[in-house]
Swiss-Prot record:
Family matches, as PROSITE patterns: GRPE
InterPro entries: GrpE, GrpE_coiled_coil, GrpE_head
Organism (species): Francisella philomiragia subsp. philomiragia (strain ATCC 25017 / CCUG 19701 / FSC 153 / O#319-036)
Entry function: Participates actively in the response to hyperosmotic and heat shock by preventing the aggregation of stress-denatured proteins, in association with DnaK and GrpE. It is the nucleotide exchange factor for DnaK and may function as a thermosensor. Unfolded proteins bind initially to DnaJ; upon interaction with the DnaJ-bound protein, DnaK hydrolyzes its bound ATP, resulting in the formation of a stable complex. GrpE releases ADP from DnaK; ATP binding to DnaK triggers the release of the substrate protein, thus completing the reaction cycle.
GO biological process terms, semicolon-separated: protein folding
Gene that produces this protein: grpE
Subunit structure: Homodimer.
Name of protein: Protein GrpE
Keywords from the UniProt entry: Chaperone, Cytoplasm, Stress response
Record's keyword annotation contains Chaperone: yes
Gene3D superfamilies xref list: 3.90.20.20, Head domain of nucleotide exchange factor GrpE
């Protein structure tokens, strides 16, 4: 083998070695770029999952808010139905009081007695009508005093009754569907 041939073989071997180095470097670059691409894809998936979770959370919150609005509207409608006549009921209370005051007076003439019976029937009809619409009378004589239902107008000593017992009622109270429209004005026992 000549020197020239030997140099050619060495050059070819060197070229082959360089090609192999380039191929492995190229493969490493390709593998690195595939790894990078995979990492980027994972990051994108993670971002999309977070966005999806965020939208799910917003949808759940919106649904809950809509449910709360619906319940609030139902409650408002129910209260409007129950307490819509409250002002009307309050305005009728003095009428009931006047009729009851008229009925307390003794009448001696026969015509007046018939008139009193008519007023009694009218009063009963009015009270029955109001009861049908949720108005309840509070006549708490003999009951324990409750500041939520009663208004103390006076206190008297009386050893026959316990303290805070309602001895007398100045003016009846009224409730509309369980809500106090007017507290009963009462005299309570205080020993």
């Amino acid at each position: 083998m000549g020197k020239e041939e030997k140099n050619n073989i060495e050059d070819k071997a060197l070229d082959n070695e360089q090609e192999m180095d380039q191929e492995s470097t190229s493969k490493a670059v390709e593998e690195l770029s595939i790894e990078e691409q995979l990492e980027r894809a994972r990051d994108t998936i993670k971002e999309l999952e977070e966005t999806c979770d965020s939208f799910k959370d917003e949808a759940l919150r919106a649904r809950a808010e809509m449910e709360n609005v619906r319940k609030r509207a139902e409650r408002d409608v129910s209260n409007a139905r129950k307490f819509g006549i409250e002002k009307f009921a309050k305005e009728l209370l003095p009428v009931i009081d006047s009729i009851e005051q008229a009925l307390k007076h003794e009448v001696k003439l026969e015509e007046a007695i018939a008139m009193k019976e008519g007023i009694e029937l009218t009063s009963k009809m009015l009270v029955d009508t109001l009861k049908k619409n949720g108005l309840e009378e509070l006549d708490p004589k003999g009951e324990k005093f409750d500041p939520n239902l009663h208004e103390a107008m006076a206190m008297i000593p009386n050893s026959e009754f316990e303290d805070n017992t309602i001895f007398d009622v100045f003016q009846k109270g009224y409730m509309l569907n369980g809500r106090v429209v007017r507290a009963a004005k009462v005299v309570i026992v205080k020993n």
